[in-house]
Amino acid sequence: MRALATAVATALLMSTATLAAPARPSIGKGAIDAAVAGITAKHGAAEEARARQGAAQVAARWFPEDGDEKAYTAFCVDNFLSGDQALSGAFDRLETVLEQVDGHLLEVRRMLLTPQDLDTGPVTELDRRLGDVDLSAHVDDDLFKTKVAFLALLNFPVHTLADRLKDGASWSRDTWARSRMMDRWALRVPAEVSQDVTQAFTAADQYIAGYYIRADKLLGPDGKPLGFPDGRRLITHWNLRDELKSHYGEGDDGLAKQRAIQKVMERIVRQEIPERVIDNGDVTWNPFTNKVGGGGDSPREPDTRYAKLLEVFRAVRAVDPYAPTAPTYIQRKFELDRQVPEAEVEKLLISVLTSPEVKALAKRIEGKLGRKLEPFDIWYAGFSSRAGRSETELDEVTKKKYPTVASFQAALPDILKGLGFRPEKAAWLSERIVVDPSRGAGHAMGALRREDKSHLRTNIPKTGMLYKGYNIAIHELGHNVEQSFSLGEIDHWALNGVPNNAFTEALAFTFQARDMELLGLADASAVERRKNEAYADLWGTYEIGGVSLVDMGVWRWMYAHPDAKPAELREATLSIAREVWNKYYAPIFGVKDVEILAVYSHMISNGLYLPDYALGHIIAFQVARVFRQGSFGDEFERVAKQGRLTPDAWMRGAVGGPLSAQALLDEAK
């Protein structure tokens, strides 16, 4: 799970009719020509091409409140820079200042969200209101108002994805850094619109963070307790999925628990779940009959899940008028953020979902299980090194090893050395990662200033760390290590990070895959582990690939039905989930109209994030092959330090070839 810093209380429900009309650029061609003429008269004809590009970039974002055409022309003539020394000086100054501004504001944001993100006690109404405060929402607006952004737009080019794919291979690191800096001003979004987006994501995130199911209160079809441990509290969807995974190899009792969890998931996505069973240890619930024990009425949850998603949709849709080159959130996520066209991502996922290797693997899984596949077997965990070990056994190991947050913090150097990082590098990393007690399942929150530290949020109960929490924490640690390298050891701050979220997920997966090894419980040979890794990665990509297609389909539907009500979105989501299942899963599982692909919480709180997980599995497999050929720690550092190039350039630098699922399919074969 990537840091939720960007998914941070209730957005304004803005319908099409209530969206405020955006201010529009007001500069005509004559004013642009006059600006170019003034610049070339001052700096020479050799600067005409740069002058025209810069003047046009400014004009495209110059609103009436910025001044009339005369003011625009004067600004361009007065602020155009020529010569390498002047341009380098301006870039260096901007890069230095932006690191400090963005970094300090992130630290403020982290502090404001502390009561909601961390398990520090009850969350008050004041805490919730403070969580709505996002000072960073106004930064770029202020940079436009003060014309700092216009100075940058006048002097440095804004590149498109097409530009980078065409010319990026020949660019220097300086050119890449300048190009990345200018991404922040490619769009001009008013602060109030950005604030609404922040509030919508915060509301969705906090809704999900409190969505626990009391497994110890679940009843089976016969009305009897299913035997989950007392106090077992599972957040949706992460813990539900991981609890389900943990019961393979436990015979009929494990199978009964898995079927119950699937039924819980179905009740959640259909919004048939009785509202009062959510995080309530005082009542029992039979998800098969949907009856609640304890007396009293038990009305269903009133489509809150889909209302939160609509709030997110309407908030991000309000950005559309300010993004002429990417006028939908879908386009912005794929072309600006992910930097891989939507159609290309879909094609890549379908290549896995329809591959003969998946069908062959399904037969292998059926053989291992000794029964026909059931829908929840999309989360089959029998290829992991923990197969055959009970959840209770693993919990006892992790509780003893990591009884507190402080103990996990103290163990970071040894964990990192166990992964293959040199002692001095393990110490360097441990000093830059802070472990916090998470209120939710856990996440990684990176820094934006090299003097700051990244934060690993992990959920450790008073009785000690459970295996599920440990598994998530090792994944999040992978994010933190990537964040530490891609910020702390980058040559240009403007290049900090990785091309998109899929890449940090990929690097985190390489940590998570070794969780049992770090506990000293990996007993298979290296060859056997590699084979199981290929099977697990292929099956995991098959599962999350379908989930991603549902996520993408839901966003397309919302854009086609912008005035939809929560109940309509619920029915559309379920229909899309059934359609994807029937096309790519029913032929293998032999069951139609299954809806559990819609259970992922990311669909509600993270806005089209799920395709990054699918891409992450594919990237992780390609990267892991390189890591095996050398020192894991050294290779991880090498690839992470490349920074925020295009996905294609990053992959070629990391593994010597483009992003492709073929390596995964070949290995599984």
Regions found by a protein language model. Name each.
Residues 7-16:
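Bacterial N-terminal signal peptides
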Residues 234-240, 382-388, 444-456, 477-489, ...:
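Active-site-adjacent bridging/hinge elements
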Residues 18-22:
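Boundary at the C-terminal end of the N-terminal hydrophobic targeting segment
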Residues 1-5:
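Positively charged n-region of N-terminal signal peptides that target proteins for export
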Residues 314-318, 485-489, 493-539, 616, ...:
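Post-HExxH zinc-binding segment in Zn-dependent metallohydrolases
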Residues 390-452:
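Auxiliary, metal-adjacent structural segments of Zn-dependent hydrolase domains
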Residues 23-259, 263-291, 319-389, 562-669:
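C-terminal, non-catalytic "cap/extension" segments appended to globular domains
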